[in-house]
Amino acid sequence: NRTDVQCQHRWQKVLNPELNKGPWTKEEDQRVIEHVQKYGPKRWSDIAKHLKGRIGKQCRERWHNHLNPEVKKTSWTEEEDRIIYQAHKRLGNRWAEIAKLLPGRTDNAVKNHWNSTMRRKVEQEGYPQESSKAGPPSATTGFQKSSHLMAFAHNPPAGPLPGAGQAPLGSDYPYYHIAEPQNVPGQIPYPVALHINIINVPQPAAAAIQRHYTDEDPEKEKRIKELELLLMSTENELKGQQALPTQNHTANYPGWHSTTVADNTRTSGDNAPVSCLGEHHHCTPSPPVDHGCLPEESASPARCMIVHQSNILDNVKNLLEFAETLQLIDSFLNTSSNHENLNLDNPALTSTPVCGHKMSVTTPFHKDQTFTEYRKMHGGAV
């Protein structure tokens, strides 16, 4: 029941006593490598003719399993085991197709690895389930970013800022960051208060100051209200005098340097002179600032305006002194006049209020008008 070809193959490959079925020697391995380089990895019958007792099948298996430099001889990795599990579950013992999924591994190496270690695990525990690999946890972003923003670090509020129509900011800092030039000028060429809140983010500065005063000293509420009104009028005056540029703030004002403000407001403390109204207008040294009354949370445009707009405060102070001077002159004229007349229709200049006066003499305009009538009545002499 056997054909001639079958008998010939059986004799040449198995039964011939001249066949060498023992281990390969170094000389045989070297000949296989040399003839593979000469004939290529396909002509195994021609290569076997140069190896006594070896057939083409033996040379091919020796090359692909051991001598090929592209074959991996390292230990098996978990990723390769996972691929073998999945492929064997789908393909079974089709080692040649499984080996195509593993570059550098031969079908014989895959089969040996399966039979030696992996098959026992599958028989006892079954195929391992594919565990969903979660991505690495994202790094926390709660670190603080250092910034030199107008000489104080900004802590963003815990809640969202009020105002639903406002566009979200592109960065974590709601203040405009002004680049620091190389040369530090001696003066700040632009009002500090206008540089503070360029993006116009609402800052609860007045509320913070008022809350601080209310908690510690309730008697100062009146002073706080007056301070708020003064700040509002000062800010409106500054906005009306000079419009804020919208682009290229650093290029238009090269003399701006944020560290100068830092030195004047935080390092120097109370006795640091600050130039705040341009290169040609200089303000007097800023008065001492009670830092205990200004908490850290009130670091805002309002606070910087208190520190850097001292010239306007000085003007207001001068107006108050001028008003007191007018009152003193009024009192002097009242006491030195010999023609005092208490007629309710033509009242004399007096610092004492009279209940029957038709007009109040508390304003400079009314004082001037009353004083003019008085001079007309008495012939222009006082």
UniProtKB/Swiss-Prot annotation:
Question: Where is the region Transcriptional activation domain?
Answer: 204-256
- DNA-binding region per Swiss-Prot/TrEMBL record: 44-67, 95-118
Where is the HTH myb-type domain positioned along the sequence? 16-71, 72-122
Q: One GO MF term, please?
A: RNA polymerase II cis-regulatory region sequence-specific DNA binding
Region entry Leucine-zipper, spans? 305-326
Q: Give a Pfam family name.
A: LMSTEN
Q: Which residues form the Myb-like domain?
A: 1-15
Q: Which GO terms describe its cellular component?
A: host cell nucleus
- Tell me if Repeat is a UniProt keyword of this record: yes
The ranges of region (Negative regulatory domain (incomplete)) come to 257-376
Q: Where is this region: Disordered?
A: 119-143
Subcellular location per the Swiss-Prot or TrEMBL entry: Host nucleus
**Record keywords, A-Z:** DNA-binding, Host nucleus, Oncogene, Repeat
Protein purpose: DNA-binding protein that specifically recognizes the sequence 5'-YAAC[GT]G-3'. The v-Myb oncogene transforms immature myelomonocytic avian cells in culture and induces myeloblastosis (myeloid leukemia) in chickens.
Q: What is known of its domains?
A: The absence of the N- and/or C-terminal may prevent homodimer formation, leading to DNA-binding and its increased transactivation activity.
The name this protein goes by in its record: Transforming protein Myb
Source organism (scientific name): Avian myeloblastosis virus
